[in-house]
C-alpha cells in the first residue's frame, strides 16, 4: 500500500477513486500522567516516552486507514491529512486521526 500527502503519485496513474478512508487512535489520560511523571526522560527538550506513544498512536491510525483502503480494493491512499486533537473531559485525551482518498492505480 502506498501513502501520500499529495493528491497524486508521481509516475503512477490513478484509474479509480474508491472513497474517503480514515483511521483514529486515542491516547488516554494515563499517557499525560506518565508523561509528567517521566519528565526526567526529557533530553534536549524532547520526551522519548511521549514521542513513542504518539508514534504508536499514529501507527494504529495508519493501520486502520490501510485496512479500510484494502477493503475497497485500493492500492494507495492519497491526499493524506494527519490531525492531533485533545478530547474528553478537561481535554485529558489526545486523538490522532488520519484521512485520505483510497485509489486504484494502473499497473
From Swiss-Prot:
InterPro entries given in the database record: UPF0145_dom_sf, UPF0145_YbjQ-like
Record Pfam families: YbjQ_1
SUPFAM superfamilies: YbjQ-like
Family: Belongs to the UPF0145 family.
Protein name (database record): UPF0145 protein ETA_21660
Natural source organism: Erwinia tasmaniensis (strain DSM 17950 / CFBP 7177 / CIP 109463 / NCPPB 4357 / Et1/99)
Source lineage: Bacteria, Pseudomonadati, Pseudomonadota, Gammaproteobacteria, Enterobacterales
Amino acid at each position: 500500500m502506498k501513502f501520500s500527502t499529495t493528491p497524486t503519485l508521481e509516475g503512477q496513474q490513478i484509474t479509480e477513486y474508491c472513497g474517503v478512508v480514515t483511521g483514529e487512535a486515542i491516547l488516554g489520560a494515563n499517557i499525560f500522567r506518565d508523561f509528567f511523571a517521566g519528565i526526567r526522560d526529557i533530553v534536549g527538550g524532547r520526551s522519548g516516552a511521549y514521542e513513542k506513544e504518539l508514534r504508536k498512536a499514529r501507527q494504529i491510525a495508519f493501520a486502520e486507514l490501510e485496512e479500510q483502503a484494502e477493503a475497497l480494493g485500493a492500492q494507495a491512499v492519497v491526499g493524506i491529512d494527519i490531525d492531533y486533537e485533545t478530547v474528553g473531559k478537561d481535554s485529558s485525551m489526545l486523538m490522532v486521526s488520519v484521512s485520505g482518498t483510497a485509489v486504484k492505480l494502473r499497473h
